[in-house]
Amino acid sequence: MTDSTPEAGAEGEFTPVKPQESELLVVTGMSGAGRSTAANALEDHGWYVVENLPPQMLTTLADLVARTPNSLPKLAVVVDVRGKAFFADIRDSLNTLAASGISYRVLFLDASDNTLVRRFEQGRRPHPLQGDGRMLDGIAAEREILALLRDSADVVVDTTSLNVHELANQVTGLFSDSGPVVLRLTVMSFGFKYGLPVDANYVADVRFLPNPHWVPALRPHTGLDQDVSDFVLIENDANEFVTRYVRALGPVLEGYRRENKHYATIAVGCTGGKHRSVAVSVELAKRLAQLPRVTVSTKHRDLGRE
């Protein structure tokens, strides 16, 4: 927001070390407009986020970061302005940053009065400036206090018509340099005899496949061994199942991206988690890794338990 050149200050003044290596974003706005949602979206895309920082501590934090280059390349500070005293603090802090040559941007989140009232009522919480009066009185007071800050913000996002996923996507688009959302998938094999994985988003049951356990030569081996993998995938045509399953997961994964979901676990289960589920999981992970904007890891939860 600022490109001011710092002046030599007297002893005890705020004089950060240059050059500044970190990107500083100040997130503020109306209560109920989505500051926490914005903070979560930024954190998911590599920002170090400090929430509910008292405005008077902003310069101290910025100075600390400036003195440790590359420690926090992207720092977002969520400032909660409650009352005229705090507004004076943030105004003074931002002026100090500007005078000291520290560049920053301000993201201001706003929403209509009716939307803010509805959100507070849904959360069954009072507005922080409401006191003993009406909620609309508190909103009006906050809007008056923040008017100048809103006018000087680098980016103003009106969240009136946005749900949490849409807001997160908009913030990500504005302040993320990492490109399209990459979905991190974990393909996990498991044995039903040991229970379902509690963190699985999807579960595939491959107990319909012939069990290598009943083949004496294969019983001591696992689904990581080539002979077991060939038995499961080739001799019994599990490849067709994997092909259809990947095809079915395609629109699901795309929907996850639209909803700003970054992680998903796909579990594949057989009886003991040793043969069939392991072989199928390895092949499934290979196929999923070929999809765009996807990274895949495998985990064999119950391998070695028998």
From Swiss-Prot:
UniProt keyword list: ATP-binding, GTP-binding, Nucleotide-binding
What InterPro entries does the annotation carry? P-loop_NTPase, RapZ-like, RapZ-like_N, RapZ_C
Does the record's keyword annotation contain ATP-binding? yes
Q: Which residues bind GTP?
A: D80, V81, R82, G83
Question: One GO MF term, please?
Answer: GTP binding
Q: Cite the binding residues for ATP.
A: G29, M30, S31, G32, A33, G34, R35, S36
A Pfam family this chain is assigned to: PapZ_C
For this protein, the record's SUPFAM superfamilies field holds:
P-loop containing nucleoside triphosphate hydrolases (SSF52540)
Entry similarity comment: Belongs to the RapZ-like family.
NCBIfam families, sorted:
PRK05416.1
> In UniProt terms, what function does this protein have?
Displays ATPase and GTPase activities.
What name does this protein carry? Nucleotide-binding protein RSal33209_2275
Query: To which species is this protein native?
Result: Renibacterium salmoninarum (strain ATCC 33209 / DSM 20767 / JCM 11484 / NBRC 15589 / NCIMB 2235)
